Curated annotation (Swiss-Prot):
Zinc found in the keyword field: no
Name under which the protein is recorded: Ranatuerin-3
Organism whose genome encodes this protein: Aquarana catesbeiana (American bullfrog)
Keywords: Amphibian defense peptide, Antibiotic, Antimicrobial, Disulfide bond, Secreted
Positions of disulphide bridges: 23-28
Tissue/organ expression: Expressed by the skin glands.
GO biological process: defense response to bacterium
Family as reported in the entry's similarity comment: Belongs to the frog skin active peptide (FSAP) family. Ranatuerin subfamily.
Domain of life assignment: Eukaryota
UniProt-annotated location(s): Secreted
Function as written in the Swiss-Prot or TrEMBL entry: Antibacterial activity against Gram-positive bacterium S.aureus (MIC=60 uM). Shows no detectable hemolytic activity towards human erythrocytes.
Amino acid sequence: GFLDIINKLGKTFAGHMLDKIKCTIGTCPPSP
């Protein structure tokens, strides 16, 4: 449903933010 889409977008956005934070700290995996 619509909420499922919102949840997926939220998780994806949160995941991207976490990746950016990890990269800032220097612990992100190398980009493909």
